[in-house]
């Protein structure tokens, strides 16, 4: 039996609550399949599109005197509940359909970051909707948001993405796992908080990369494998070119060389690769699987996906 952290990509979860729910239902079947095979899993998820949409909607309401403005940390908490609820419901229904009595819990999770992290001066995490260049330039002019081109898919707003230091609710996660509970935690990389005097915490405007927090979680609970589910079936080098090549198996040294060659897009594939390297360096016997949400079953059979080992 293996202990596995499964990290679901926010971009792979669809563009609307309805689309997300359908995708989550299908994913639940694959995740429950892991459980029926005897594996112990913990689930994390991204929230880039979702938290951006929540923040955009609330800001629009505030600008039109229809409600208060909400800080980004609170928007992150809302996205954890929204995505976690749909995952939780789908998993509960799937478990019930096969007669398995197992509790599923979504845990609102805070993650400590350093307020002096250089990421706060260099926003890099894409969030929210995709725009064409003209739309992005107009919004940037009106609101002062920073936009970047995102892996050939359009322009998106970017926000700071500091490194995760510690998971505040880690001991609660461990307790739930010990009590045979299926845990959904660290959604969106966790709600970013900074440590204040007397060990208090305060939310800060940022979005932590969910794969980096998932790698930290995996190391902290000593899991055997980290599965990163995204929108593409393999990790590629020379991505979106005539020489595009999938990586079926690779290792840490090879990936570091590809990073030096700028093979992985900042804000999309690069943090996934950095998370994979971090996980394996902290857990040399572990492995990482990166593939698409829709190909999880095939990937678990070794038919698709990128496998990374030491």
From Swiss-Prot:
Its main location: cytoplasm. Keywords: Arginine metabolism, ATP-binding, Cytoplasm, Kinase, Nucleotide-binding, Transferase. CDD domains: AAK_CK (cd04235). Its EC number is 2.7.2.2. It is an enzyme of class 2 (transferase). Gene3D superfamilies: Acetylglutamate kinase-like. It holds the Pfam family AA_kinase. One of its GO terms (cellular component) is cytosol. One of its GO terms (biological process) is arginine deiminase pathway. GO terms for molecular function: ATP binding; carbamate kinase activity. It catalyses: hydrogencarbonate + NH4(+) + ATP = carbamoyl phosphate + ADP + H2O + H(+). Pathway: Metabolic intermediate metabolism; carbamoyl phosphate degradation; CO(2) and NH(3) from carbamoyl phosphate: step 1/1. It is found in: Cytoplasm. It comes from the Bacteria. NCBIfam families: arcC (TIGR00746), PRK12352.1 (NF009007). Belongs to the carbamate kinase family. This is Carbamate kinase 1. The gene is arcC1.
């Amino acid at each position: 039996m293996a202990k596995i952290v499964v990290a679901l990509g926010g971009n792979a979860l669809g563009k609307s609550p309805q689309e997300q729910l359908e995708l989550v239902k299908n994913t639940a079947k694959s995740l429950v399949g892991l459980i029926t095979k005897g594996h112990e899993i913990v689930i994390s998820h991204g929230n880039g599109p979702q938290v951006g949409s929540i923040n955009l909607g609330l800001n629009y309401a505030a600008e039109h005197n229809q409600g208060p403005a909400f800080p980004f940390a609170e928007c992150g908490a809302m996205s954890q509940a929204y995505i976690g609820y749909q995952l939780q419901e789908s998993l509960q229904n799937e478990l019930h359909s096969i007669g398995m009595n197992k509790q599923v819990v979504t845990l609102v999770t805070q993650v400590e970051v350093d307020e002096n992290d250089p990421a706060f001066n260099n926003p890099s995490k894409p969030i929210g909707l995709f725009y064409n260049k003209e739309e992005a330039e107009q919004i940037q002019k009106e609101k002062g948001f920073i936009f970047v081109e995102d892996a050939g898919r359009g322009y998106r707003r970017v926000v700071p993405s500091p490194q995760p230091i510690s998971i505040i609710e880690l001991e609660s996660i461990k307790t739930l796992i010990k009590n045979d509970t299926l845990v959904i935690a660290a959604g969106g990389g966790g709600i970013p908080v900074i440590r204040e005097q007397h060990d208090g915490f305060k939310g800060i405007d940022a979005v932590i990369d969910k794969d980096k927090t998932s790698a930290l979680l995996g190391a902290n609970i000593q899991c055997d494998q980290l599965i990163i589910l995204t929108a593409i079936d393999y990790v590629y080098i020379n991505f979106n070119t005539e020489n595009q090549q999938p990586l079926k198996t690779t290792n840490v040294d090879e990936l570091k060389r590809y990073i030096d060659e700028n093979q992985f897009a900042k804000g999309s594939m690069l943090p996934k690769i950095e998370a994979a390297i971090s996980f394996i360096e902290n857990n040399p016997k572990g492995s990482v699987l990166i593939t698409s949400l829709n190909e999880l079953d095939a990937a678990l059979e070794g038919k698709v996906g990128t496998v990374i080992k030491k």
